[in-house]
């Protein structure tokens, strides 16, 4: 945390009761970057907003949104404030957004796993997630 952010946090702590501050600190410690969610080319923004809300609910800190044909617009009535607590990275260059996102995730040490409706693929329950960080693409 930068000095400016640290000083701001210290200043703002004066205005929060200890019980609330302890709750925030507890919840922050329960967040995970071991699992991240990747949403590729989702047609309806409310589906992304609902996914962000679910990520927040499960303690997932990072959500990656890949825009190829569809542009993400947060639906605040669906995300219900979760977008303020979950870090969102949007890949929206002119081309190769999926490839760029996958490369970044792999460079960051994630095993990339794509959800697929095919029967011949492996079952999600067979994937070992305790050792390596995983990025689930939907």
Predicted regions and their residues:
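Post-transcriptional modification and biogenesis factors for structured RNAs
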Residues: 1-138
């Amino acid at each position: 945390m930068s000095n400016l952010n640290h000083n701001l946090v210290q200043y703002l702590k004066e205005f929060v009761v200890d019980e609330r501050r302890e709750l925030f600190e507890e919840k922050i410690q329960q967040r995970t970057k071991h699992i991240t969610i990747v949403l590729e080319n989702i047609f309806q923004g409310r589906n992304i907003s609902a996914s962000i809300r679910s990520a927040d609910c499960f303690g997932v800190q990072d959500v990656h949104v890949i825009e190829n044909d569809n542009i993400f617009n947060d639906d605040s009535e669906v995300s219900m404030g979760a977008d303020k607590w979950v870090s969102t990275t949007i890949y929206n260059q002119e081309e190769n957004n999926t490839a760029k996102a996958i490369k970044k995730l792999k460079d960051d040490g994630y095993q990339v796993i794509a959800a697929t409706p095919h029967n011949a693929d492996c079952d999600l329950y067979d994937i070992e997630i305790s050792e390596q960080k995983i990025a689930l693409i939907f």
